[in-house]
Amino acid sequence: MASTVLRRLEGKVALITGAASGIGESAARLFSRHGAKVVIADIQDELALNICKDLGSTFVHCDVTKEFDVETAVNTAVSTYGKLDIMLNNAGISGAPKYKISNTQLSDFKRVVDVNLVGVFLGTKHAARVMIPNRSGSIISTASAATAAAAGTPYPYICSKHGVVGLTRNAAVEMGGHGIRVNCVSPYYVATPMTRDDDWIQGCFSNLKGAVLTAEDVAEAALYLASDESKYVSGHNLLVDGGVSIMNQGCNMFDLMDS
């Protein structure tokens, strides 16, 4: 348990979508350790309920493509804890692993955009609805480092994540007048239990040698954006990619230079 001095979200209420696993679960656990009351919104009921049991958190079943579900999740946070300080729009899917536009199905494109972008739109809309009267709040969405560097990403995924960045910036302009900050965090490849010990994977997906991005690292970035430490940060796309987005892998002259 973080000490009182280090509990950066003490007294705050956070709603996290897609919090039953992955980045969302890591954020739920981290936010809770830092004093936040956490509402977990997900479609994976059993996994989410187990996390709630661990954290003493609240669970609400939520399909982020359905406005009623998202509205209910936000209302649950307010009715249970009296307010909503932090909205983390994290629910997302990658879609089919098809990389050529000619092989991309419209049905998959729509499905990915519905979850990744429409879900963020609905979460932002309803979080703003309850935050505006209080003239404060932090809305954070999970985008992707692929928005900063094209790298053979499936079209549905990359289009949805670019949309998240655009939505974030536009909402930041509007919400700034109400004292509400809107940002997104853009991770690169996140190691999973199956890949984190694979040397090839670590080398391929890391520019910072010896470092591999984990869900916990992304949660730490979200914690910063959720906390008062980032009180003057809004409209920002926080890249958590180890510098990959600024590096041209096909023309890395530093590897050719003498030391």
Swiss-Prot record:
GO cellular component terms listed in the entry, alphabetical order: mitochondrion
Domain of life of the native organism: Eukaryota
Gene Ontology MF: a single term: oxidoreductase activity
Subcellular location: Mitochondrion
Catalyzed reactions per annotation: borneol + NAD(+) = camphor + NADH + H(+)
A matching Pfam family: adh_short_C2
Residues reported to bind NAD(+): 21-23, 42, 63-64, 90-92, 157, 161, 192
Chief location: mitochondrion
Temperature dependence: Optimum temperature is 32 degrees Celsius.
Record pathway: Secondary metabolite biosynthesis; terpenoid biosynthesis
Tissue spec: Specifically expressed in glandular trichomes of mature flowers.
Functional summary from the UniProt entry: Involved in the biosynthesis of monoterpenes natural products related to camphor. Catalyzes the conversion of borneol into camphor.
Protein name: Borneol dehydrogenase, mitochondrial
Source organism: Lavandula x intermedia
